[in-house]
């Protein structure tokens, strides 16, 4: 009986230890408004800068994935784009600033469609950091 209790305690301990060691995915989300009907400039900017940096980051193992979601703007939610960068674990997430600084320095100048600066055609209304992913509707 004592052996069974020890085994049960060890099993439960390993379950909790496994969850503590679980490196669940973490995302950042930027909610972006396109300004002054400059959709072409904004899309060009994100495809040739934001996306390029994320592709570089995937190739280096700095991020897990990225997505761009497009949605119609509304009075309550005046953003058109949601930019999502997902990290495979807390270690990747915690190193994000250092890693993206390295990639930005390597990439060099912004690739813009014309003389318009990013502040003229896009505005990040708000962002969410440290967005955790749920698995099978159970929060980890």
Report the location of each language-model feature.
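Sec-dependent signal peptide cleavage junction
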Residues: 19-35, 119, 136-140
């Amino acid at each position: 009986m004592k052996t069974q209790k020890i085994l049960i305690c060890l099993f439960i301990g390993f379950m909790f230890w496994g969850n503590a060691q679980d490196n669940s995915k973490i995302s950042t989300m930027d909610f972006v408004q396109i300004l002054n009907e400059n959709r072409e400039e904004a899309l060009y900017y994100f495809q040739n800068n934001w996306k390029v940096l994320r592709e570089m980051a995937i190739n280096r193992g700095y991020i897990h994935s990225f997505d761009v979601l497009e949605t119609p703007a509304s009075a309550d939610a005046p953003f058109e784009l949601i930019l999502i960068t997902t990290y495979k674990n807390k270690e990747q997430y915690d190193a994000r600033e250092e890693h993206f600084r390295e990639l930005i320095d390597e990439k060099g100048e912004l690739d813009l469609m014309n003389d318009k600066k990013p502040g003229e055609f896009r505005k990040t209304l708000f962002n969410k950091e440290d967005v955790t992913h749920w698995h099978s509707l159970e929060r980890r």
